[in-house]
């Protein structure tokens, strides 16, 4: 009888060790700082549409911090620079927002998001001719940004 319990205990222990060794499966699902920032930006846009500017700005600030971290880890990524320009512009710093956009365009001149958002920045800062140049780049993209 004791032998039976001992064998059962050993088998249970053996299966427990194997299942713990397999892990939880979460190791590969950690979101990057960039991905987290994009999710936060989407949330901020929803608050902005509802007129909740303060909540939107808090999210833009949070996203901006994550994007700065992302840019340090993987510098000069056009998508990251696009959203850095976007969050910076949304927080009212048009000059630095423009710098991020222009740096992104040096890397990827036909980047749809950068051209769209830079055009918006030019409209807000009353530089319509420059906004039209951004539109010209988007003219043949067959995209909603145009």
Task: Please give the residue ranges for each predicted region.
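Conserved structural position within tetratricopeptide repeats
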Residues: 65, 69-72, 102-106, 139-140
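Residue-level recognition of tetratricopeptide repeat
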Residues: 77, 111, 145-146
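TPR/TPR-like (Sel1-like) alpha-helical repeat modules
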Residues: 106, 119-145
């Amino acid at each position: 009888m004791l032998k039976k319990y001992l064998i059962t205990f050993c088998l249970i222990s053996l299966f427990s060790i194997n299942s713990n060794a397999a892990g939880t499966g979460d190791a590969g699902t950690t979101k990057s700082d960039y991905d987290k920032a994009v999710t936060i930006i989407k949330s901020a846009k929803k608050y902005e549409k509802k007129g909740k500017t303060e909540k939107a700005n808090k999210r833009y600030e949070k996203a901006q911090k994550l994007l700065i971290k992302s840019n340090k880890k993987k510098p000069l990524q056009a998508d990251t620079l696009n959203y850095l320009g976007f969050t910076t512009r949304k927080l009212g710093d048009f000059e630095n927002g423009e710098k991020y956009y222009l740096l992104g365009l040096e890397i990827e001149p036909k980047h749809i998001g950068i051209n769209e958002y830079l055009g918006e920045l030019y409209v807000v800062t009353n530089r319509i001719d420059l906004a039209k140049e951004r539109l010209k780049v988007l003219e043949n993209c067959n995209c909603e940004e145009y």
